[in-house]
Amino acid sequence: MQSIFGTDGIRGRFNEEITYSLAYKVGYALGSTLEKEKPILIGRDTRISGDILLQAITRGLNESGKKFINLGICPTPAIPYLIKQENLSSGIMISASHNPPEYNGIKIFDHSGQKITKHFENKIQKLIEELNQNISVPRKVIPLNKNKDLMDIYIKSLIQTMGGENLSGLKIILDTCHGSATTCAKKIFQYLGADVKVINNSKNGLKINMNCGSTNLEPLKKALIESPAHMGFSFDGDADRVIGIDSKGNVLDGDHILFLWGRELMEQKILTNNLLISTQMANLGFEKAWEKIGGILYRTDVGDKYVRDAIKEKRAVLGGEQSGHILSKINNFSGDGILTALQICKYCKKKNINLNDWLKSSFEPFPQKLTNINLDFNINKLNPKTKILIDQTIENFQAIYSDNCRVYIRPSGTEPVMRVLVEAKNHDKVNSLSSEITKKLFSEINKIIN
C-alpha cells in the first residue's frame, strides 16, 4: 500500500482518495496508539464532506476507546494552540486547506501541537493496513456536541497578541472565502475597533476557495475599489494562511510579510542571527533585499512542516512561505492567517504608517511565473524506479537553465500536478523560459510513464 500521507497530512478527492472507511481507520488507529486518559481535539472547515469524515473519525475513536472533543468548524491553528493550552493528547483537523470543495483531508497534530513526524505517520499507516476490511457508512448519523468554550479561548488568545494595541481608525476588508475564517475573523477585528467589511463570509462548503480566498485575490481587489479601505486580507479555506492587499491594490504575500516582520524583529534585536526561514518558492528579489540589510535567508523544501523543522534546527524565530503561511514564536510556530493579519495591522498602527508605504519600503520582486503541469497520476504514488527517473529529469532541467534564471520544479504533494517556477530579471525572459521548460518537461515525463 502506498503511503496515504503527503506533504501536509492526508489529502485527496472525497469518495476517491479520502473515504468514510479511510477516515474511520485513521480515527481507530490514532485512538489505539494514544494514551486513553487525555482526549483528542477535532475540528473541520466548512466542506460538505467534513461532517461525514467527522462522523467516521469519531466512530473510529469511540471504537478504539479514545475520548474526543469536537470543536466544530474552526481555523486549523485553533487545534494546535488548544492542544498545548488544554494539555490534550493530540488533534485532528479535517480540511483540504486551499484546495477546491471536492477535496478534503486529515491533518494530525501531536501532544505539543506540532504536525506528527514521519515515524508516527508510518506507525498510523501500518495500523491502517492491518484494518483491511471496508467500513460502510451507517444509515443513522449521530449528532455530535460542539465545545464552544474552547473556541472562545482561542479567540481571546489572538486578541491578546495585540498587546493592548487597538485597530480603531482602520478600515479593513476581509475575504474569508466561505471557510474556517467565517467563524471568528470579523468578530476579532471588530472587537479590536476596526471598521470591518467581510466578503465571501457564508459557511457554504460548496463555495469554499471557489474564485475567492488567498489563491484568488480578484474579489478582494474589487472590494477595495468599490469600498476604499486601508487594507484587505484574504484567507484560505482553513485560515492557516493569509495574503494582504494595500489600499492601492498591491499584493502583500508571504515573502513581503516575512521581510517586513523580520526587519522589525531585527531592529528590536530579537531575530536570532538575523535569520529567516522560507522555501524554494521564495522570490529571489526578497532574498537579495534581505541579504542587503544584513539578513540570512535559509531555504527548505516546500511545505510548512519543512519550514518548522528548519526553524527548530536553526533556532530561528520567524519563517514562512510565499503562499502566506507564516510561522512565528508567538503561536508556537503554527501557521495562523488571522494572527498574521493582526500583527501586520499592529505594526502599521504602532509605526503610524499605512500599509502602502510600509510595503514600498520592502523590496521589488523579481518577475516570477508558476505553472502547473496537469498529470493523469499522482507522482508521489508511482513506483520508486519511475519516480527516480522523473526526479533525475527534473534535476537535469534545473541544471540546464540555472545560468539564465532560477528554475525550481517540484511535484505537488496534494494534487496530480507538477509545479514549475521560473524567475528572471524581466517578464519576457520569464514567459519564454517558462513556456519552453513546461513543454519539454511534460514531453519527457510522458516518455518515462509510457
Swiss-Prot record:
This is Phosphoglucosamine mutase. It comes from the Bacteria. The modification Phosphoserine is found at S97. CDD domains: GlmM. Binds 1 Mg(2+) ion per subunit. It comes from Prochlorococcus marinus (strain MIT 9215). It is an enzyme of class 5 (isomerase). The lineage of its organism: Bacteria, Bacillati, Cyanobacteriota, Cyanophyceae, Synechococcales. Gene3D superfamilies: Alpha-D-Glucose-1,6-Bisphosphate, subunit A, domain 3, Alpha-D-phosphohexomutase, C-terminal domain. It catalyses: alpha-D-glucosamine 1-phosphate = D-glucosamine 6-phosphate.
